[in-house]
Amino acid sequence: TTGLGSDTVIGDSGEINYAAGVITGLQSTATDQGGDDSITALGGDNTIVGGFGGDAITTGSGDDSILGDNGLIEYVDGQAVRLSSNDDEVATTGADIINAGAGDNRILAGLSDDEVTTLDGDDVVLGDNGELTYSDGVLTGAVSSEMALGDVDTIAVGEGDNIVIAGQGADTVTTGSGSDTVIGDSGELTYVDSALANAVSSGAALGDVDTLNVGEGDNIVIAGQGADIVTTGLGSDTVIGDSGEITYTAGVITDLQSTGTDQGGDDNITALGGDNTIVGGFGGDIITTDSGNDSILGDNGLIEYVDGQAVRLSSNDDEVATTGADIINAGAGDNRILAGLSDDEVTTLDGDDVVLGDNGELTYSDGVLTGAVSSEMALGDVDTIAVGEGDNIVIAGQGADTVTTGSGSDTVIGDSGELTYVDSALANAVSSGAALGDVDTLNVGEGDNIVIAGQGADIVTTGLGSDTVIGDSGEITYTAGVITDLQSTGTDQGGDDSITALGGDNTIVGGFGSDTITTSSGDDVILGDNGELTYFAGILTAAMSSETALGDVDTIAVGEG
């Protein structure tokens, strides 16, 4: 036990070096010898190396440097520049209990089942082995080592901008409010001029089921391998469910991507209110967000940024085996969701949402959507997508999908397709992969909706409003948001569609197959088979059937108008 002051304590064997009375280095010696020490240091900037065994280390307020097991600390001009835990086998370590008081603490718990608790301050904690580097007292790097070693750590840090790399094992991490950076398994953090430059998980095949409870603030979480449980408080959080990498320039995010895409688990991620960014990664994940403008990738992918704003979101799995059946529940707000492959369920509350049911890409300029396009069009499965009130955009993708939208002017493509926007107005909507797709059920709410159902015997129902519907494949062109042309494409592909449009001035092209078309009151324009409509200043000027030899027996019932 030491009193008030800045004490240096080695619990077992060790060596401390000085030059001209200034400390230059400190290290454990005889690392396979020692005992279970109890070390208490009262207030001050203390340096403690527990050494061999399971030690109990307690400090009062101050900026403490603590190594739970064996290790070394190097100094320049009396300031620590490198702290490293260096046990290469669990036998020389122990289950340490570390309680650090308020302050900016540096803690390397080492191997075995450790418990680390800190009070308020900007703490840096490594749950297992690793290294911290500093320049002039400012953190430059934190990295895991001996990544295959480690065990079940419990880490709880107080309020502040904390940094935690939990390491190997099924760890539990809890942080108070603040802008925290947490890696659930092994990883590396690089800092330039005190700002985070790179965060990356390492050892993608290593790790376990972590429970990460991160408090209020703008947090960064890379959960790592395993079926992790991640919960974040209010704030704009960035979360990768499995392995990944995030890059920054001058503290501003530039790139976020999945790594080790064939490794991971079925994660459960909950982010409370804020503009959150979440990449679920490998497996069938459950992702839940509260109100805010969220960006969510259900599987593996990447997001690119310019000046801190997302300009490209892309899901990039090229095989179903690296994905899973995700369940995504997004709160009210203007959400961007790329569900990825497999049988996904997507539900959103009110807002102008953009949802891709399978793989694809979204592009933005100054925060405004410029394009949405499907990719890996032959892949995908049965998605269920339900979006709330608002002007929503949905490209459901491959498979027998069910799409339901609330009231608003929605744009829905039942299978694969591409949407292009100019000055925030729709310029072109086109289905793609005409021979691909399945029987979709599209229930579109009240509003002036645009629907291209795609391949298959689709069931389309639209609410009150002036809707534009193509039963099979097609393309619609606009100038400054005003329609100029509508035509069937892939005219030898499609199915026997059932299209019901409630009251309004609806435009419907049934396309290939034997279609059933029903409208309510309104001035409707209907082509039972393939065809083209041309417009001038938004007014229909010509209607022409095409590929008449490919038609079939349609049933058309129209209401008053």
Segments the model singles out, each with a brief description of its role:
Residues T1-G561:
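Acidic, glycine-rich low-complexity segments
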